[in-house]
Design a protein with these regions (language model features):
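Conserved MFS/SLC helix-loop-helix module at the cytosolic interface between two early adjacent transmembrane helices
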Residues: 99-135
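Helix-breaking motifs and short loop linkers at transmembrane-helix boundaries and internal kinks
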Residues: 80, 112, 133-139, 335-336
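C-terminal transmembrane helical hairpin of 12-TM major facilitator-type secondary transporters
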Residues: 316-359
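Helix-loop-helix hairpin linking two adjacent transmembrane segments in secondary transporters
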Residues: 139, 168, 177-224
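Cytoplasmic helix-loop-helix junction between adjacent transmembrane helices
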Residues: 143-182
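Juxtamembrane intracellular "pre-TM" segments in multi-pass secondary transporters
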Residues: 35-45, 225-257
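Helix-to-loop junctions at the C-terminal end of transmembrane segments
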Residues: 101-112, 301-314, 397
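Paired small-residue
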Residues: 127, 138-147, 339-347
Length: 432
């Protein structure tokens, strides 16, 4: 089940040694792919260890990434802070992670992807164990920001590591296992802490969740095979920056970067403050309100159908259908009735995953010679949207309530629809 954090086509995909035209810079080592050992094949013990190791890397990292989202109402009550301030515990992580993804991807070309994955997962979850000791909001936000910095190595390099080490014929299966780990990890990071609130405070709930994330990291370290096909490359930051600059001058890519920023920001904003609505307006206990994150399961259907729709009717049509579902879902989510509101949330969830599945794949297709940089920039904008809009939406919710929050998010979605339409028209003109 892909979640907003973990579509396989949105991750920088620099894998095995590539030529200069693919990276925008000459390789530091002329070793050819033919001189490297064959990629791991399904049925080999090392293949299964690799797939399981990346499964646990996803479980650990995406658990840690969103571990405070379901705890935000509890943080507001315990610390006497506003929802916008509580949202900083999510925005700090995703914002710093967004800024660190591209440097981490480039650095991994020199230091090795496996080492970076191990360090990132272990260090981030160890820091997570210290978060319950934070004396106040300031230190908690600092700790969450540090977690975001450390976590960046996993989404920036995990899929590239798989593409590097696994035989191409068996790669989709391994990728699917990793994506499943991301999805389940993200759900655990939301459901487990909220469920524990019925029996304990936020500190205990967070400590238990981070203890589990650390256990996932340790398992990953123990079973991760040694890299066999890694070839270090010289760092060419200027060349990378020139490539990224060219991508922003392409209106189709720039539009898709904006689509990722807006729709991810809207999606995270809705779920950041949905718990407050369920608890304060409808009287649900925190443990029951946390079950709303199960609506993420709509992402399974949406991502698959979005891909099929893009293949059958075109990416432009598919992305606009997803955006339309968001436009329909938000007014329904504003209704003051629980059983009417939840289908609206489900519709927006479905629409978001459709948009994300199509946009992330479209970015790679538009930049075949610099796919890694384009996918990395999409991820950067995607997580920045989560951070910036997730925080700003907290001020709207605190000042004007749920209905105004839905209007604000609807306005953002309409801007996203405009960008998506511009991308679709531009793509049609180029095709013609």
């Amino acid at each position: 089940m892909p979640t907003p954090d973990e579509n396989p086509r949105t991750t920088p995909d620099k894998a095995t040694p590539t030529n200069a035209s693919e990276t925008g810079a000459p390789a530091a080592d002329p070793v050819s792919t033919a001189e490297l050992p064959e990629g791991l094949r399904h049925g080999q013990p090392a293949y299964h260890r690799a797939a399981l190791a990346l499964l646990f890397a996803g479980l650990a990292s995406f658990n840690a990434m969103y571990c405070t989202q379901a705890l935000m109402p509890a943080l507001t009550a315990a610390m006497r802070i506003t929802p916008a301030q509580a949202a900083l515990t999510v925005s700090a992580t995703t914002g710093i992670l967004a800024l660190a993804i591209l440097p981490a991807s480039v650095l991994s070309e020199r230091t090795g992807r496996g080492r970076l994955i191990v360090f990132s997962a272990l260090a981030a979850t160890v820091v997570g164990l210290l978060l319950p000791l934070a004396p106040g909001l300031g230190w908690l936000v600092v700790g969450r920001g540090l977690q975001g910095l450390l976590l960046a190595g996993v989404p920036a390099t995990a899929m590239a590591w798989l593409a590097q080490e696994i035989h191409p014929r068996d790669l989709p299966r391994a990728m699917g296992i990793y994506v499943a780990g991301n999805s389940v990890g993200g759900l655990i990071g939301r459901l487990l802490p909220s469920g524990l609130l019925q029996f304990s405070g936020w500190r205990t709930a967070l400590a238990v969740d981070m203890g589990l994330a650390l256990a996932f990291s340790v398992v990953m370290v123990v079973i991760l095979p040694r890299e066999r096909r890694f070839v270090p490359k010289a760092l060419h930051f200027r060349s990378e920056l020139r490539t990224m600059g060219r991508q922003w001058r392409d209106p189709r890519l720039a539009g898709l970067f904006g689509v990722g920023f807006i729709f991810m920001g809207v999606f995270v904003s809705l779920y950041n403050f949905l718990g407050y609505r369920l608890i304060d307006r409808f009287g649900l206990p925190p443990s029951l309100a946390g079950l709303v994150f199960l609506l993420y399961l709509f992402g399974t259907v949406a991502s698959a159908r979005g891909g099929r729709m893009a293949a059958e009717r075109g990416r432009g049509t598919a992305i606009l259908v997803g955006a339309a579902a968001c436009v329909v879902g938000l007014p329904i989510a504003a209704v003051n009735n629980l059983w009417v509101m939840l289908p609206g949330v489900a519709a927006l969830t479905y629409g978001f995953f459709t948009v994300h599945a199509v946009a992330s794949g479209w970015v790679g297709a538009l930049a075949p010679k610099s796919r890694g940089e384009a996918s990395g920039m999409y991820l950067t904008c995607y997580y920045l949207g989560s951070s910036v809009l997730g925080y700003l939406s907290g001020h709207v919710f605190h000042a004007a309530g749920w209905a105004m929050l839905m209007m604000w998010l609807l306005a953002l979605v309409l801007v996203g629809c405009l960008l998506a339409g511009m991308v679709a028209r531009s793509a049609r003109r180029v095709a013609a």
